[in-house]
């Protein structure tokens, strides 16, 4: 990883206003597919720009910023999807976000292919737990349909 880029990310200043948070999230959203549970991690930052309240940077926002910076500067190796390998889809839901990881089994080891993470709409946050979990499965199946329908083996959920 290019050390000048790593330094630029690590030196990213604490946002002083909503515009600064939007700027950071704009860059962060590009890499969301490489970060497990991105929506949960970034939630405090999104809450800050969505609220009609005065800008107030607190511990949850700082933790989210620091966690995202750490993820951006840590090399995570995703593998290419191989339709000859067995796929595994793992999903989860929290009170406000859904997420999933698609993996393949190579040489007896599961390797991540992609991550998915989305914030739930306000009405979806009212769903019962089982419905939230099913929503995460449906969203993941829709997102990775092109891999799973072409797979030569059955896939696991």
Regions of interest found by a model, annotated:
Residues 76, 83-105:
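Conserved beta-strand/loop block within the catalytic cores
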Residues 106-135, 139, 152:
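A short, polar/acidic, helix/strand-boundary loop motif
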Residues 83-86, 110, 149-155:
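Short amphipathic alpha-helical interface segments
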Residues 1-85:
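C-terminal reverse transcriptase regions that engage the nucleic-acid substrate
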Residues 28-31, 133-151:
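Metal-dependent nuclease catalytic cores in nucleic-acid-processing enzymes
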Residues 40-48, 146-157:
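Substrate-binding beta-hairpin/strand module that engages nucleic acids
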